[in-house]
C-alpha cells in the first residue's frame, strides 16, 4: 500500500486497522466483506482470492480488464455463493431507479433511441512526486493497467441502454483516437460508439476529454425525451 495514502487515511480514522497488503485483509477472520477499488488490471486476482477466502465483495467498475476475467469472476460468484456487487453508480441512484420504473411501466411509450455522453475538459492526469511513479499514479492513461474511456466512463452509460431496454445489443461499431492530449498517453482521449439492438433501436456513446458541453443520457420517445 502506498504509504502517503495510509497516512492520509489515518488522519481521517486514527483508530482504523491498517493492512500492508490485501492478503492480510483476506486472512482476517473478522472481515466479512471487502471493497476493491484498485486500478482495473488488479481487480481479477484480488476478487478471485477474496472469493476463495469466503469474503463478500463490492468491486468498483469496470469489473475486469478482459471479458474472460469478467466471465470467470461471475462463475466464481455463482459457485461460492458469495455476494458480489459492482460499483455502477446509476444502479444505486434513486433518480435512475425511479426513471427505470417509469420506463418499464410503459409510461412514455416505446423507446426509439438512446444517446449517451460523458465529456470532460481536462487531461485526466494527476500530479506525481517522482517520474518513476508516473505509470502507477496515472494508471488510467496506460494500456497495461487501463482500457481508457470505455472502462472508466462508458460503462456507466452503456448500462443505461440494457437497463432501459432489458436486453443486450447485437451489434457494435466504434472508433477512438488521440487527437488533443498528445502527451505520451496510450489510451484514446475521444471515442464514439453505436450499439444496435435486435429491433433496430440504436444507442450511441460519445466521450471526449477536451470539451465538456454535452452530457449525460437522453432516452428518446416519439413525443418526448427523458
Describe these PLM feature segments.
Residues 181, 207-214:
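Glycine-rich phosphate/pyrophosphate-binding beta-alpha loops
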Amino acid at each position: 500500500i502506498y504509504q502517503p495514502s495510509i497516512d492520509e487515511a489515518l488522519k481521517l480514522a486514527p483508530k482504523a486497522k491498517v493492512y500492508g497488503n490485501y492478503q492480510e485483509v483476506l486472512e482476517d477472520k473478522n472481515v466479512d466483506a471487502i471493497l476493491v477499488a484498485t486500478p482495473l488490471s488488479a481487480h481479477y486476482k484480488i476478487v478471485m482470492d477474496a472469493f476463495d477466502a469466503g469474503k463478500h465483495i463490492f468491486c468498483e467498475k469496470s469489473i475486469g480488464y478482459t471479458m474472460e476475467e469478467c466471465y470467470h469472476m461471475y462463475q466464481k460468484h455463482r459457485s461460492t455463493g458469495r455476494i458480489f456487487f459492482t460499483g455502477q453508480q446509476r444502479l444505486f441512484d434513486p433518480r435512475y431507479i425511479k426513471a427505470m420504473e417509469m420506463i418499464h411501466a410503459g409510461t412514455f411509450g416505446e423507446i426509439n433511441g438512446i444517446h449517451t455522453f460523458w465529456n470532460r475538459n481536462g487531461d485526466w492526469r494527476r500530479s506525481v512526486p517522482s517520474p518513476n511513479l508516473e505509470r502507477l499514479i496515472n494508471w488510467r492513461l496506460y494500456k497495461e493497467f487501463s482500457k481508457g474511456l470505455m472502462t472508466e466512463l462508458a460503462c456507466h452509460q452503456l448500462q443505461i441502454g440494457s437497463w432501459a431496454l432489458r436486453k443486450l445489443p447485437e451489434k457494435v461499431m466504434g472508433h477512438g483516437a488521440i487527437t488533443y492530449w498528445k502527451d505520451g498517453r496510450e489510451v484514446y482521449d475521444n471515442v464514439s460508439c453505436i450499439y444496435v439492438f435486435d429491433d433496430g433501436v440504436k444507442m450511441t456513446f460519445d466521450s471526449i476529454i477536451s470539451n465538456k458541453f454535452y452530457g449525460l443520457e437522453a432516452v428518446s420517445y416519439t413525443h418526448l425525451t427523458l
